[in-house]
UniProtKB/Swiss-Prot annotation:
InterPro entries: Anticodon_Met (IPR041872), Met-tRNA-synth_bsu_C (IPR004495), Met-tRNA_ligase_1 (IPR023458), Met-tRNA_synth (IPR014758), Methionyl/Leucyl_tRNA_Synth (IPR015413), MetRS_core (IPR033911), MetRS_Zn (IPR029038), NA-bd_OB-fold (IPR012340). Its cofactor is Zn(2+). Keywords: Aminoacyl-tRNA synthetase, ATP-binding, Cytoplasm, Ligase, Metal-binding, Nucleotide-binding, Protein biosynthesis, RNA-binding, tRNA-binding, Zinc. GO terms for molecular function: ATP binding; metal ion binding; methionine-tRNA ligase activity; tRNA binding. It is found in: Cytoplasm. This is Methionine--tRNA ligase. Is required not only for elongation of protein synthesis but also for the initiation of all mRNA translation through initiator tRNA(fMet) aminoacylation. Its EC number is 6.1.1.10. The gene is metG. It comes from Methanocorpusculum labreanum (strain ATCC 43576 / DSM 4855 / Z). Belongs to the class-I aminoacyl-tRNA synthetase family. MetG type 1 subfamily. The lineage of its organism: Archaea, Methanobacteriati, Methanobacteriota, Stenosarchaea group, Methanomicrobia.
């Protein structure tokens, strides 16, 4: 138990689409963490809400001929309902477009302005002459100036993953009509992020949570820290103080929502939000794709405005489906409601799978086959089998619960389990925590199998009674510690044990209180197996969705939409001759640490081996790249990506980064004409 009050938040789901499996990788671990620590006695408030601003929502509203607020409310309600169905119990689930967040955002910004951390600057901004409007964020597409991959607005989401400031994107085109964008002057406001470099380098080493978040942020700050444009020219959003035309950039008001939603909760429950945000710990659960927002932008903004920064940031790994990249456009996605809840599958099964499958920071590869295997082997065969065997034997052989004391060795085993599980939870090692819970059930399974009370019942009923009473104590402990993982199933088990209260009202320490009931409830199998037929039906849904997406893409006239406009700038043969293109062979490939999209390649170009850093890790594995022959620009000025020097550039086509390779085998270093 910790005496400090703690506010735990989860990254805000964006109200421009439905909830999918990737979302749950953040919310279920957050819910588990809160549930477990609360039942250890910690004072925790659990906060989330929906992110309602930004250009994608406006684009959707325009396409659907409705308002951004209406779009936001629709998806807000969807996420709220799905979270409740999945047993994710926030104390407050707010909206960033609600008045409390507008007020808190303006207040924080005004403080930053008053303290000299915000300045005005005229910049070159993309403008569509056909649509007659400036193109903030997702209204513009083009080329990333850092890695050369296709980028959208404020982020290179198909390449190096860098945040892009307004005006940085190269070869900009209007995302709405495809017209080549013009650059026009526009006044915007910048946050002096560069002024916080020393503060961040002092603060980040003290940040708790998962190492992937801390290390990624430190690398980012050490590499470069540019000032941050915090305004956009649009109507939808929080109005920037003193401006009629500008709103705040969505990544300004979105995290402020954590504070605003806590305010709303405090007002509704007669509590103090300052108790948690000023005096307590502040823990953020997020996806690894938004680390720099939460570990760089957010703490700098808070520090500048006089607020306390995050105490810990817990960043989950990404999700793949059957070994393939998660992709909504390609149909490689599992929708939480449509594919899971609407099929009648228990929320507890998915909660267990996502927590138990792998370490929180590692990539989680989802497959229905693995899902079936884990549920059947671990829940049905181990946990459920032990609980059912223990209680059924008591009812059939004794009727009432044997009135003998539980042996000391059983309490010692439970106590060891409780200590190990608590240590894992507080260290954000959720797989280890769930493994610890299952190990206690496995211990019980082994204990009852070795003791075989069904054989002893005739020759030594007292010994059989002792064994079964010991087993009931273990079942009770398992129910209590499994509740944060599987709330509904644990309540059912609790009632089978003869209890009538809510299991969530009991502290974890009750696992060491002797089992006191004299009778058991109605004992039934706790878990149902996932049969092959059901698993095959789920796999068929996924396969059909992927096939339908391919057909849809093939049926469209996609050429104009996908192919970028041909440049109007004319070059000469002399310009082309400046490029020294050579055939290279990749001799070594590895992922760049603390990144999700960068590969570090060692490429033999005939005369030497060079290091090239490329944003293709989401398309090619390091193993796929080794021995591959590629075309390399060898006279390109060296550049740095995430602190790694890149001495050359390879060629790739489209968002899928299809590599340009020689059709015939030619020696390394061969010049391309």
């Amino acid at each position: 138990m910790t005496n400090k009050p703690t506010v735990v938040t989860c990254g805000l789901p964006y109200t421009n689409g439905f909830c999918h499996l990737g979302h749950l990788r953040t919310y279920i671990p957050g819910d588990f963490y809160v549930r477990y620590l609360r039942r250890l006695g910690d004072d925790i408030v659990f906060i989330c809400g929906s992110d309602n601003h930004g250009t994608p929502i406006v684009v959707t509203a325009e396409a659907e001929k409705t308002t951004p607020r209406a779009v936001s409310e629709t998806y807000h309600a969807h996420f709220d309902n799905v979270f409740k169905s999945m047993g994710i119990a926030f104390d407050r689930f707010g909206m960033t477009d609600d008045p409390t967040n507008h007020h808190r955002t303006v207040s924080i910004l005004q403080t930053l302005i008053d303290r000299g951390y915000v300045y005005e600057q005229t910049i070159q901004q993309s403008y569509c002459p056909k649509c007659k409007r400036f193109l903030p964020d997702r209204y513009v597409e083009g080329t990333c100036p850092y890695c050369g991959k296709h980028a959208r607005g404020d982020e290179c989401d198909s390449g190096c993953g860098r945040h892009l400031e307004p005006g940085e994107i190269l070869d900009p085109v209007c995302a709405t009509c495809g017209t080549k964008a013009e650059l026009r002057e526009q006044k915007h406001y910048y946050f002096k992020l560069s002024s916080f470099r020393d503060y961040l380098l002092e603060y980040l080493p003290t940040l708790g949570g998962t190492l992937n978040a801390k290390n990624y942020a430190i690398g980012w700050v050490e590499n470069e820290l540019k000032d941050w444009c915090i305004t956009r020219m649009m109507d939808w959003g929080v109005k920037f103080p003193g401006s009629d035309d500008l709103v705040c950039y969505v990544w300004v008001d979105a995290p402020i929502g954590y504070i605003s939603f806590t305010e709303e909760w405090a007002k509704a429950t007669n509590n103090s939000w300052q108790k948690y945000w000023c005096e307590g710990d502040r823990v953020h659960f997020i996806g690894s794709d938004i680390i720099y927002h939460h570990c760089v932008f957010w703490p700098a903004m808070l520090h500048g405005a006089g607020y306390q920064p995050p105490t810990a940031v817990v960043a989950s790994g990404m999700v793949t489906i059957d070994g393939e990249k998660f992709s909504k456009s390609k149909g490689n996605v599992v929708w939480t409601k449509e594919d899971y809840l609407d099929k009648g599958l228990p929320a507890d099964y998915l909660r267990y799978y996502l927590l138990a499958y792998t370490s929180h920071t590692r990539e989680l590869d989802f497959s229905w086959k693995e899902f079936q295997a884990r549920i059947n082997n671990e829940l049905v065969n181990t946990f459920g089998n032990f609980a059912n065997r223990s209680m059924s034997l008591v009812k059939t052989k004794f009727g009432d619960v044997p009135q003998v004391p539980v042996e000391a060795e059983i309490f010692a085993e439970i106590e060891r389990s409780l200590a190990a599980i608590e240590e894992s939870v507080r260290a954000y090692e959720f797989k280890a925590a769930v493994d610890g819970i299952l190990l206690l059930a496995a211990y019980g399974n082994s204990y009852i199998s070795n003791a075989a009370p069904w054989k002893l019942i005739k020759e030594d009923p007292q010994a059989a009674a002792q064994i079964l009473k010991n087993c009931l104590q273990i079942v009770k402990a398992c129910a209590l510690i499994m509740q944060p993982v599987m709330p509904e199933s644990s309540q059912k088990l609790w009632e089978m044990l003869g209890y009538t209260d809510k299991i969530e009202s009991r502290p974890i320490s009750d696992a060491l209180v002797p089992f006191e009931n004299t009778t058991l409830g109605d004992v039934k199998p706790l878990f149902a197996r996932i049969e092959d037929k059901q698993r095959e039906e789920m796999e068929a849904v996924l396969t059909k969705r992927a096939e339908d997406s391919k057909k849809k893409a093939a049926g469209k006239n996609t050429m104009e939409a996908v192919i970028e406009p041909i440049s109007e700038e004319i070059i000469t043969i002399d310009d082309v001759a400046k490029l020294d293109l050579r055939v290279g062979r990749v001799v070594k490939a590895e992922r760049v640490p603390k990144t999700t999209k960068l590969l570090r390649l060692q490429v033999d170009i005939g005369t030497e081996v060079r290091q090239i850093v490329s944003g293709i890790a989401d398309v090619y594995t390091p193993e796929e790249m080794v021995d591959k022959k590629i075309i390399v620009v060898v006279n390109l000025k060296p550049a740095k990506f995430r602190g790694e020097e890149s001495n050359g550039m390879l060629f790739a086509a489209g968002e899928e980064a299809s590599l340009l390779v020689p059709l015939k085998d030619v020696p390394e270093g061969t010049k391309v004409h």
